[in-house]
Amino acid sequence: MAARRGRRDGVAPPPSGGPGPDPGGGARGSGWGSRSQAPYGTLGAVSGGEQVLLHEEAGDSGFVSLSRLGPSLRDKDLEMEELMLQDETLLGTMQSYMDASLISLIEDFGSLGESRLSLEDQNEVSLLTALTEILDNADSENLSPFDSIPDSELLVSPREGSSLHKLLTLSRTPPERDLITPVDPLGPSTGSSRGSGVEMSLPDPSWDFSPPSFLETSSPKLPSWRPPRSRPRWGQSPPPQQRSDGEEEEEVASFSGQILAGELDNCVSSIPDFPMHLACPEEEDKATAAEMAVPAAGDESISSLSELVRAMHPYCLPNLTHLASLEDELQEQPDDLTLPEGCVVLEIVGQAATAGDDLEIPVVVRQVSPGPRPVLLDDSLETSSALQLLMPTLESETEAAVPKVTLCSEKEGLSLNSEEKLDSACLLKPREVVEPVVPKEPQNPPANAAPGSQRARKGRKKKSKEQPAACVEGYARRLRSSSRGQSTVGTEVTSQVDNLQKQPQEELQKESGPLQGKGKPRAWARAWAAALENSSPKNLERSAGQSSPAKEGPLDLYPKLADTIQTNPIPTHLSLVDSAQASPMPVDSVEADPTAVGPVLAGPVPVDPGLVDLASTSSELVEPLPAEPVLINPVLADSAAVDPAVVPISDNLPPVDAVPSGPAPVDLALVDPVPNDLTPVDPVLVKSRPTDPRRGAVSSALGGSAPQLLVESESLDPPKTIIPEVKEVVDSLKIESGTSATTHEARPRPLSLSEYRRRRQQRQAETEERSPQPPTGKWPSLPETPTGLADIPCLVIPPAPAKKTALQRSPETPLEICLVPVGPSPASPSPEPPVSKPVASSPTEQVPSQEMPLLARPSPPVQSVSPAVPTPPSMSAALPFPAGGLGMPPSLPPPPLQPPSLPLSMGPVLPDPFTHYAPLPSWPCYPHVSPSGYPCLPPPPTVPLVSGTPGAYAVPPTCSVPWAPPPAPVSPYSSTCTYGPLGWGPGPQHAPFWSTVPPPPLPPASIGRAVPQPKMESRGTPAGPPENVLPLSMAPPLSLGLPGHGAPQTEPTKVEVKPVPASPHPKHKVSALVQSPQMKALACVSAEGVTVEEPASERLKPETQETRPREKPPLPATKAVPTPRQSTVPKLPAVHPARLRKLSFLPTPRTQGSEDVVQAFISEIGIEASDLSSLLEQFEKSEAKKECPPPAPADSLAVGNSGGVDIPQEKRPLDRLQAPELANVAGLTPPATPPHQLWKPLAAVSLLAKAKSPKSTAQEGTLKPEGVTEAKHPAAVRLQEGVHGPSRVHVGSGDHDYCVRSRTPPKKMPALVIPEVGSRWNVKRHQDITIKPVLSLGPAAPPPPCIAASREPLDHRTSSEQADPSAPCLAPSSLLSPEASPCRNDMNTRTPPEPSAKQRSMRCYRKACRSASPSSQGWQGRRGRNSRSVSSGSNRTSEASSSSSSSSSSSRSRSRSLSPPHKRWRRSSCSSSGRSRRCSSSSSSSSSSSSSSSSSSSSRSRSRSPSPRRRSDRRRRYSSYRSHDHYQRQRVLQKERAIEERRVVFIGKIPGRMTRSELKQRFSVFGEIEECTIHFRVQGDNYGFVTYRYAEEAFAAIESGHKLRQADEQPFDLCFGGRRQFCKRSYSDLDSNREDFDPAPVKSKFDSLDFDTLLKQAQKNLRR
């Protein structure tokens, strides 16, 4: 009423929304509660189209917007619009004043309100007055809303989701007096309220009237509502709802921005999806201008409206004043809403109930005539920035995209308020922007949807006016948004911007004063107009400054945001309106320019109005990208991660359409650029989940860049952005409206929706399908990260180029999304240098940079909907951690080699940014880590967060743990790193991260020779990258394998080390490996070569060649175990797993030096705990240690050699599976176990030992054998060197091979080996032991040539390893020949026989007889070493003896029988410390083996291992049982002591209903009770015992305990316990009860383990 009075007095209501004539018009002076919020203004006060928001108590979500469209309503002073109608009051009063149909409508509305709308009696009266006025004014020209509504419809019960529709505009102002009624003394807001007919937005869905956009636009007098017209209610059959001209009713709904009744009704079916808030008057203006630029005049609009009403809701029809009339109004009432000639103002009424959930806002925007761009509402409008929703011509659109907002410029103040409303209603959860053409984000901001919806309604009114013509031409854009405080970014942004602009503009505020309370749609439009007018940031800032004052309720937050934005000189965000205006690529410009970012990326906007505002601001920023991308305020910056997006919004933006908004990625994110006649600006399916403010914010930020662009388009000025598309939108709205506003999300109303979906599907196909729909914080990206590792690279790679192309093609938009994430700048021509470098981008847009990661994530979504769009954006949006979520994809870092290709693949959405960032792949974070060392791996994820694109890299941390090893390798391959991003679809994130982690690329540089090729391979040769990918996938499981497989990461390290030893050859080979799967093998070989040095190098060459062929096939397999082995063997003597381990030590130290150590650390990270535990616990563990170290070496090699070694090793394990290798592995397993079993245990051990690759048993097995082989080879070399050969040569010495291997490293690189093993494997203890012996042994066997030769044989052990000149021949025969064992024993013969020794190992496994002498020699040698090497030495000794043993099976069995006992005993004795136990078991093993054949010893070891384990387990159990018995005994003693101390009180005659706790509670009054028990007996009294801490308390209980009984209870029988309690346990009741409550001490479990005991116990239980 205050607003009414203010209007009458010509006083603008206070912007504060106070009860006085403030924007809220007193109707809702203080809050959203019963009165329309001040920010919305007294809806009635809004000129053009006032919206009375019947705001639910809930707030934004529910409110009825009475849109007073025509000046007539304004003139009639429809103050009731500003009033909030209470359901009950409204119904009662209405019933008294209205006919049944009207009452029914109201009732429906009330039902919608669900008593959430608390309407004051005043409001009721106002509403009645407005209705009366409408009815009175009804004439042939101005149909009564009710006239156009069939009685049946009027009587129809409210439908769900049609509350906005039910909020029917009671009257429609004449077109000339439509939304824009300069007459309004208070300004557009007040004037429009007065001038416009009452616009009743009834949330009740049953109101079939489409939102009275006509109300907004048309005067209430218009007889738009014709009862005769039976138009299917939106809710019922949106598709059938068409105007007589055939246009879909949806169009009308869009025109009736408020869609009060109509939209509410539509909401039932289509409106629900098509929330009242058409959201963008500007859009309407655009579409209307373009489509309906020619629309005849108000007359046509009226007729069109009638038709529309027929198709849509009658109430809508009046609102749909023809654009011409609307334009007339604009001219006549510039203050009210100065829309460009082609502009349609959408007034959207947030429907409290419907809007809360999902509202689609059909926005019909006429494209502004190119010429009339300044057709801003008026000079007065211009005066009022908000009013001046300039409908920029195409030419000026670029300059002032905001002008489109003119639609909303109905009221500047209102514009803000309206915008808010729109934000609440219109932007309420726009699930999808059905409008392919309309890139209006208004739908996005759900928080502000209600205010935005009002404004949209107003826009729609005008739109409705021009709708007749424009409807068909333009698409009605439906934005589904939840009206409960969730606004799409676009709308919210608009409202925010509007508020910012408008608030600074007092005149605008005056105009929108009443509306600002609740009917902010017009204020929003006005704000847009003002923003357009003040295209410069200062206007925006000023607006922001004033915005906060103007917006009180929900808008308050926006003002704050706006203020912050405004505070920040960067109008970019703020520029959503202003900057958009100022920026060459404003929404209008977008519309005008096909390049304009059609897709509104404001995807899920935070429910939080503030967030929404931020998002909106960000969107705005995006659109006005030319303005400073600098985020206006941190919050804005966050939500404005969009800022980067802003950049892409440049004219080049057109392609950006596809870019989905961060969270928006849900679905609408990538609405195709609508190829509508206007700009291809596609309506982004702004399917935002405002419910999650954080998500919304994130999506704002996340979508910041791209979403921002879109959001700016959409949120900036949904109409503005949409305006170009308005035509399409209108059409779409009609069609969609017909289809179903409710199902708007489900049904692609406009092409843009279809396109969007199509694109989304494509993106999903390209990248893992990440439903954008769950943008809220899911970590789909995380889940996808694991799956995407291998898959994404391939999938992404092909799509990436295409997407990239598309993104590049429209870098503006993609960058908008991608820009931030991937490097908006690179991807987008839209100049945002910062984008080009994520870091730079973040500097440019400090907050945006932060947001950028978020956006970056959305960008990946853009790349591939599945990868990041849905989840990543949401994650991104949800939290900076999204980077973590994306981080998962960063896990991909392992496949850095592929990143080059991956960047492409990764960049389905981000390809461009990614490509730009390719150097800065998401891996950069990992590279960053890599430089530090594998241990740093986890940091990279953090680093990315730190980096300019923290959000993007929040995810990498996610995977960082699993991928820690890979990341290190990745560092060398900076560009390759993109692979991970690609696979993960966090590419954008990665890219930013890379920018942050350019240093990692340096490592690649150091490894330059290997790295470049790996990159090439990853990019050019999918096979190679696939290898990487597979290893990467496995990488988390096996760091070694990963490094090996992920040559990129591991390889670089290796290469670095490698160059020193065998740099030339390894380089060449590494290159080859990089180029092809061989690369990995080569890398490994080269690393090995380095380790072996010259001999190794020579062998490496042939081996590499062999390995390549083999490895290549295996690589594709992800890890052909045999091939890896072969590869490994060439690199290292791939004789036995143990040998390999040894070799690992040597080569690893040599080859990888620090790199290897780093790799070891990585492995350590993943494997340390498990490996140690498994190895330590079992003798196998010690063997596992050998194996693990080999894998570690393998990893090291992989790292040093470009990951080739690891992969080969991993594959080699298959070869190693051969008896010899298995024998080596046997160290882990008891000698008795078959080679396969050995292998399996090895795998298990490896799994335990290294978390890296063992995840896959096969991988583990292969890796482990690989490692074992390497270790063994080194061990063999050492043995040969030290003449320990015999003991070491035999395969059976697999257990001890690790010792031998240790030896070899000392010779080559003992120090490195030790650190590597220790750091890398958490086998530190093992390795320490091994290393020590190795060091001592190393000197013993110093001859490097010997090592080389030995290595060859060892490698030969895997037949391919024999690639070495001599080894090849020997391999087959020697494997089978038993002579190898002696050779092994003898250092001289060792080299040639070594292969035979390996073979012999195989035989040993086969249990083939072997010469005893070699065995004994080996055993002796090993034994000596064992004493030196302790556990590792002994293990190797036993291994050697077993391998060299040629004794018969009988001796074997004998040794088995002897050895296992010793071993077991030793083991059990040493069980306390894994190392000691290992040593002792090894020693015992070796001693027993020495006494018996090595073969028997080997088998013995196998059998021994398990049995000691069993023993130790048994011992543990015994000890545990003993401890349990001890505990029980202690309890008994304690009880006895308590009894003796008289602290136990016996309580007899306990009632049966009493519980122990109750008893304890009763008697606790006497003191602290230590124990309380109750014993129930079938016969006799129940009794219990209470043990007090002190005897005095027990005495007190006995003396006074009887007083505790209740009246209905018998007195307790109290005495000191012990008398009966501890009588002989002959009392069965006592006994059983005691066991029940107090289990008797259990005898040692062993006693109960034997059958007799168990049987007795069972029988005893049965007897009980």
From Swiss-Prot:
Residues annotated as domain RRM: 1543-1619
Biased composition (Basic residues): 455-464, 1400-1409, 1501-1519
Domain of life assignment: Eukaryota
Region of interest (Necessary for interaction with CREB1 and NRF1 and for transcriptional coactivation), ranges: 433-467
Residues covered by region (Disordered): 1-44, 167-255, 436-555, 681-701, 735-793, 818-873, 1045-1068, 1093-1130, 1182-1209, 1334-1528
Listed GO CC annotations: nucleoplasm; nucleus
Chain intervals with Gly residues compositional bias: 23-32
Bias (Basic and acidic residues): 1096-1113
Segments of skewed composition (Polar residues): 482-499, 533-549
Induction record: Up-regulated by serum (at protein level).
Biased composition (Low complexity): 201-224, 522-531, 862-873, 1365-1383, 1427-1459, 1468-1500
InterPro entries (alphabetical): Nucleotide-bd_a/b_plait_sf, PGC-1, PRC_RRM, RBD_domain_sf, RRM_dom
Keyword Transcription regulation in annotation: yes
GO molecular function: RNA binding; transcription coactivator activity
Alphabetical keyword list: Activator, Nucleus, Phosphoprotein, RNA-binding, Transcription, Transcription regulation
Pfam families referenced in this protein's UniProt entry, alphabetically: RRM_1
Primary subcellular site in the record, as a coarse category: nucleus
Biological process (GO), any one: positive regulation of transcription by RNA polymerase II
Biased composition (Pro residues): 12-22, 823-836
Location of region: Necessary for interaction with CREB1 and NRF1: 1379-1450
SUPFAM superfamilies: RNA-binding domain, RBD
Role, per record: Acts as a coactivator during transcriptional activation of nuclear genes related to mitochondrial biogenesis and cell growth. Involved in the transcription coactivation of CREB and NRF1 target genes.
Protein name according to UniProt: Peroxisome proliferator-activated receptor gamma coactivator-related protein 1
UniProt organism field: Homo sapiens
Gene from which the chain derives: PPRC1
